[in-house]
Regions:
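Short beta-strand/loop segment that forms part of the nucleotide-sugar
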Residues: 38-48, 68-72, 99
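Donor-binding/catalytic cores of nucleotide-activated saccharide
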Residues: 78, 99-211, 216-231
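A conserved acidic beta->alpha catalytic loop
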Residues: 28, 46-56, 74, 103
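Glycine-rich, basic loop-to-helix element that forms the pyrophosphate-binding segment
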Residues: 72-89, 96-102
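Cell-envelope/extracellular polymer assembly enzymes that use nucleotide-activated donors
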Residues: 7-10, 41, 196
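Membrane-interface aromatic/basic loop that binds lipid-linked glycans or pyrophosphate carriers
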Residues: 3-6, 292-367
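Short, well-formed alpha-helical segments that are part of the catalytic scaffolds
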Residues: 17-33, 56
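Catalytic core of nucleotide-sugar-dependent glycosyltransferases
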Residues: 214-221, 227-253, 265-268, 285-289, ...
Length: 367
């Protein structure tokens, strides 16, 4: 339970061998002028780093009492490190920040202001993508965060199903801590560990708030987990399969390959529009992994057919494919036509590249 005097936000950093990036991340969190000290605690979980991250954290903690460092003796990966940090957090809200990324200037002030004004279960924030060249670009679907002047302060996924198309990352959301722990879902080991938590939170939340300001800078790194070509990307399938099981069970979450968790929350009835949006998001996520060359060549055909099987298994009744090239891609996936998919892939990639080159609006950092 959150007690008197507890901070408003607990920032949780799962730290694993990112010494080249960690100081800048810490500066972005602690260096914001005018941030009330009592509103913030930072819990850094050193995931048995071997590159000096532990020393960087301990040195910083000696200068700033808002930072608490937990050292793990064996590396468990970012998912379990987040869970350890969550267990130690005292804040009303928790924000999982990756230590190779940055908070944008003014982010904490903007976030705390929105949290205080509408007390949501989940706050969705905007972000910038910083590529290795240093070039930045706005987040895909940033327009989804726009709030009409007369709109209510919070909403549900049923009211705006397209919100499921925002990134599945944990760092793009600020969670009410007791709401999150009440979901009885966890960040598992491995990659794509954010998917089940993100989906369960959005499906369950009665109060979702939107912050149409850039609060986070996501660094695209060559050697990050999600940018590495690996058979580990097959873990995306059990991640989404657990989400479909969650919707079918009415909100009693099951971990990938595991039984339903007793005592979990009951989801509101999942509308046809929400189910269709989650389905489309899953298929698009699968196909993006394949299109970006993240699956080794030897596993691509198998990955495609696993995607096609999920398409046929989870396609909602009456589902209408999207228009244009994306709809053609979905049709080819449904048929399991790998050869046609390989031909269509470059066209879809060109469409996506054009969308990135001509964004609907230019995102601005929070200030």
């Amino acid at each position: 339970m959150t007690g008197p005097g507890a901070p408003l936000i607990s920032v949780v950093l799962p730290v694993g061998n990112v010494a080249d990036f960690l100081p800048a991340c810490l500066d972005s969190v602690f260096g914001e002028p005018g941030q009330p000290g009592g509103d913030l605690e930072v819990i850094a979980v050193d995931d048995a780093s071997s590159d000096g991250c532990g020393h960087i954290l301990d040195t910083r903690a000696g200068r700033d009492p808002r930072l608490r460092v937990i050292h793990l003796t064996e590396s468990a990966g970012p998912g379990p490190a987040r869970m350890r940090g969550l267990a130690e957090a005292a804040g009303t809200y928790v924000w999982f920040v990756d230590p190779d990324d940055l908070l944008a200037g003014g982010a904490l002030a903007a976030v705390t202001g929105r949290l205080a004004s509408c007390r949501p279960d989940v706050l969705l924030i905007d972000y910038l993508i910083r590529r290795r060249s240093g070039r930045t670009e706005p987040s895909p679907g940033a327009a989804l965060l726009a709030v009409p002047p007369a709109a209510a302060a919070t909403l549900t996924l049923a009211e705006r199903p397209a919100l499921i198309n925002r990134t599945m990352t944990a760092w793009s959301k600020v969670f009410r801590r007791e709401f999150l722990t009440g979901l009885r879902v966890c960040f598992p080991p491995g990659i794509h560990e954010d998917v089940q938590v993100s989906c369960a939170a959005l499906l369950s939340a009665e109060r979702i708030a939107l912050l149409d300001r850039v609060c986070y800078v996501y660094r695209r790194r060559r050697h990050s987990f999600l940018a590495t070509t690996s058979m580990a990307h097959f873990s995306i399938f059990p991640a989404y399969e657990s989400v479909f099981a969650l919707m079918d069970a009415g909100g009693n979450p099951a971990g990938p390959g595991g039984p339903a968790a007793p005592g979990g929350p009951r989801l509101p009835r999942v509308s046809a529009a929400v189910r269709a949006a989650v389905f489309g998001r899953a298929i698009e996520h699968y196909s993006t992994i394949l299109a970006n060359g993240l699956v080794p060549r030897r596993g691509r055909r198998e990955f495609f057919h696993r995607m096609a099987a999920d398409y046929r298994r989870y396609r909602p009744a009456g589902y209408q494919r999207p228009p244009g090239l994306r709809g053609m891609k979905f049709a080819v996936i449904e048929r399991g036509a790998y050869g046609a998919y390989r031909v269509l892939g470059p066209l879809n990639n060109a469409r996506a590249a054009m969308a990135r080159a001509w964004p609907a609006r230019r995102a601005q950092p929070a200030r």
